[in-house]
């Protein structure tokens, strides 16, 4: 059969399955593709095809992830499923698989388990904004009251981590039975996708967000002024816009963009993804440097102290061979530059072993433009020893 031309008319959403090992994440992923395939919205993928997720070398870390895509009547989805718990931790912290929403799979037969809690916490920390619950293996539970109990438990757990537990859709189903083609259970998969369509909003496009460009290089053009180059991370910048220069300085400086150049051509505007040079009015060459960002006035601030969720590379992944302790002072690489920072470990944690993931407080020696969700890597003498994501700004 000829491959159907891919319709890009539908809005695109990135989602993934999360939850405890053996609660049925991969079976559910297979069931979604199989049920939607009947309506022509997907290519059916068997459990084995998804479970044999290729290992990806993402920036030197090995992550196994399965990517599938499918469509409902209103949307196009890219869906990630990770076989192992460590893969989720790495994926979510490095942002290798960005999620606009998650389907939390909980076995009705077992109820919430340790990784259920961990994945909810991780989702909260790395900023997965919406969660829909699929209560799986309901064919194995005859007792209606027991199902209601498990549902209440899951809702309470979600509320505990700051998700709206009372409002989150919970669908009771059986991924395996749906995969085997039993109509009643297939209907539950359709119900799940209807809830996902309705409950997880279409993400704001990068171009609709406030302008931000990390500065990679700076040079001066005689008679014209100072040019900052970099790749626009989000938003749109137009000639004549007033922007701020943020980070690595006591206070933000304000300037007007008097020219935008790309591939040696002058443009009226540039947008997310473009590599540009921005000509800045009244800025001396020494007042601006790599590692700062240009951003829409008031949209982002420079901070030096924050809490972060961090994944420390194992020895096998090229990380440290020995643990580190509180007051460890590595470099934190944000966007285009390294800044030294001091690590404080949580109460009761003496040390961090290679391969661990942990929440820590970091204080940089100079402020950097950061927000919740900003990704960074931790480096020591030029080599990466960990990855992190800003969970909360302290000051």
From Swiss-Prot:
Residues 60-64 are annotated as: G2. Keywords: Cytoplasm, Elongation factor, GTP-binding, Hydrolase, Magnesium, Metal-binding, Nucleotide-binding, Protein biosynthesis. Residues 10-204 form the tr-type G domain. Disulfide bonds: none annotated. It is an enzyme of class 3 (hydrolase). Residues 136-139 are annotated as: G4. One of its GO terms (cellular component) is cytosol. Residues 81-84 are annotated as: G3. GTP binds at residues 19-26, 81-85, 136-139. Mg(2+) binds at residue 26. It is found in: Cytoplasm. Residues 174-176 are annotated as: G5. Its main location: cytoplasm. It catalyses: GTP + H2O = GDP + phosphate + H(+). It comes from the Bacteria. The keyword Ion transport does not apply. Signal peptide: none annotated. Residues 19-26 are annotated as: G1. Its EC number is 3.6.5.3. Belongs to the TRAFAC class translation factor GTPase superfamily. Classic translation factor GTPase family. EF-Tu/EF-1A subfamily. Monomer. NCBIfam families: EF-Tu, PRK00049.1, PRK12735.1, PRK12736.1, small_GTP. This is Elongation factor Tu. It comes from Bacillus cereus (strain G9842). The lineage of its organism: Bacteria, Bacillati, Bacillota, Bacilli, Bacillales.
């Amino acid at each position: 059969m000829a491959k159907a031309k891919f319709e890009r008319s539908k809005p695109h959403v990135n989602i993934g399955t999360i939850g405890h090992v053996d609660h049925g994440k991969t079976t559910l992923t297979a069931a979604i593709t199989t049920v939607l395939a009947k309506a022509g919205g997907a290519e059916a993928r068997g459990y084995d095809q998804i479970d044999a997720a290729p290992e990806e070398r993402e920036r030197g870390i090995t992550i196994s992830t399965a990517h599938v895509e499918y469509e409902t009547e209103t949307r196009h989805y890219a869906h990630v499923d990770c076989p192992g718990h460590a893969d989720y931790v790495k994926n979510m912290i490095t942002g290798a698989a960005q999620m606009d929403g998650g389907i939390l799979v909980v076995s009705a037969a077992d109820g919430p388990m340790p990784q259920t809690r961990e994945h909810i916490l991780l989702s909260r920390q790395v900023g997965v904004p919406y969660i829909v619950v699929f209560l799986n293996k309901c064919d194995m539970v005859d007792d209606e009251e027991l199902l209601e109990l498990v549902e209440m438990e899951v809702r309470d757990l979600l509320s505990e981590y700051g998700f709206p537990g009372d409002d989150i859709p919970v669908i009771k189903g059986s991924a395996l039975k749906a995969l085997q083609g039993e109509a009643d259970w297939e209907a539950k998969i359709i119900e799940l996708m209807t809830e996902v369509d309705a409950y997880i909003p279409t993400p704001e496009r990068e171009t609709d967000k406030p302008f931000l460009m990390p500065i990679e290089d700076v040079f001066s053009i005689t008679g014209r002024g100072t040019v900052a180059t970099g790749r626009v991370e989000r938003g749109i910048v137009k000639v004549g816009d007033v922007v701020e220069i943020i980070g690595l300085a006591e206070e933000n400086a304000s300037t007007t963009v008097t020219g935008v150049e790309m591939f040696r051509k002058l443009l009226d505007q540039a947008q997310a993804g473009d590599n540009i040079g921005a000509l800045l009015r009244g800025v001396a060459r020494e007042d601006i440097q790599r590692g700062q960002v240009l951003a829409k006035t008031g949209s982002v601030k420079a901070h030096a102290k924050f809490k972060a969720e961090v994944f420390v590379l194992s020895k096998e992944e090229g990380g440290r061979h020995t643990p580190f302790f509180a007051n460890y002072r590595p470099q934190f690489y944000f966007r285009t530059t390294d800044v030294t920072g001091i690590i404080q470990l949580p109460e009761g944690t003496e040390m961090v072993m290679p391969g661990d993931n942990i929440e820590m407080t970091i204080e940089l020696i100079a402020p950097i433009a950061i927000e919740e969700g900003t990704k960074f890597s931790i480096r020591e003498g030029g080599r990466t020893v960990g990855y992190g994501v800003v969970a909360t700004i302290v000051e």
